[in-house]
From Swiss-Prot:
InterPro entries: AceGlu_kinase-like_sf (IPR036393), Asp/Glu/Uridylate_kinase (IPR001048), Uridylate_kinase (IPR011817), Uridylate_kinase_bac (IPR015963). The keyword Cell membrane does not apply. Its main location: cytoplasm. It is found in: Cytoplasm. CDD domains: AAK_UMPK-PyrH-Ec (cd04254). ATP binds at K10, L11, S12, G13, G53, R57, T160, Y166, D169. Pathway: Pyrimidine metabolism; CTP biosynthesis via de novo pathway; UDP from UMP (UMPK route): step 1/1. GO terms for cellular component: cytosol. Catalyzes the reversible phosphorylation of UMP to UDP. It comes from the Bacteria. Inhibited by UTP. It comes from Cupriavidus metallidurans (strain ATCC 43123 / DSM 2839 / NBRC 102507 / CH34) (Ralstonia metallidurans). This is Uridylate kinase.
Length: 236
């Protein structure tokens, strides 16, 4: 029995690379889509916000001397490429994915329209939100917090390459332990970088919990949906 009826899944662009140094690894994206298909079959309504860091990172571009707003718009276009790849992989897995973009690109995808997104979720379609918030200076984590709040998601599932939030970097500190649950305030006081500050504050204000888990760990997404001990739950 699923623990959640409607979720917002945040996928980082980097997660789509698999073991590659750049771009989209087809086997990796197919594995993610198969995981999503499993929870859709359980009757869970799934919306996805996807990053673009495997193609272009606005923050990195800005740091290299590029105008930050221009770099961020380029990053938004990178998320569009990822969203279309995800939608295509879903089609091959017999899931109906619908891409809605915060930037208008009418020949390619639908614009973001909240009531339409909610209706599509209720119809069992997976809605993929592309182009972040549509505004520069906001990350795709913030887009996940925003869209999750707008569609009435019960939780934001932050899919990463690490299986939760740790007391320290587990790659550097072998004694680091994983938090099973932690409050927003505790995460802030311990300076744990769960999401960027804007996204984190929005989730906290909206009382929207965050689950951090590993998307590369087989079966982890399904275990999260079933309410099993997987990843770290950040709560009010």
């Amino acid at each position: 029995m699923p623990a959640y009826k409607r979720v917002l899944l945040k996928l980082s662009g980097e997660a789509l690379m698999g073991d590659d140094a750049f771009g989209i690894n087809r086997a990796t994206i197919e594995g993610m889509v198969n995981d999503i298909a499993e929870i859709v079959k359980l009757g869970v309504q799934v919306a996805v916000v996807i990053g673009g860091g495997n193609i272009f990172r606005g923050v990195a571009g800005g740091a290299a001397g590029m105008d930050r707003a221009t770099a961020d718009y380029m990053g938004m276009l990178a998320t569009m490429m990822n969203a279309l790849a995800l939608q295509d992989a879903m089609r091959h897995a017999s899931i109906e994915g619908r891409v809605q973009s915060a930037l208008r690109m009418d020949q390619v995808v639908e614009p973001y329209i909240r009531p339409r997104a909610i209706r599509q979720l209720e119809e069992g379609k997976v809605v993929i939100f592309a182009a972040g918030t549509g505004n520069p200076f906001f990350t795709t984590d913030t887009a996940a917090a925003l869209r999750g709040s707008e569609i009435g998601a019960e939780i934001v599932l932050k899919a990463t390459k690490v299986d939760g939030v740790y007391t320290a970097d587990p790659k550097k500190d072998p004694s680091a332990t994983r938090y099973t649950t932690i409050s927003f305030d505790e995460a802030i006081s311990r300076n744990l970088q769960v999401m960027d500050a804007t996204a984190f504050a929005l989730c906290r204000d909206q009382k929207l919990p965050i689950k951090v888990f590993s998307i590369v760990k087989p079966g982890a997404l399904k275990r999260v949906i079933l309410g099993e001990d997987e990843g770290t739950l950040v709560h009010v």
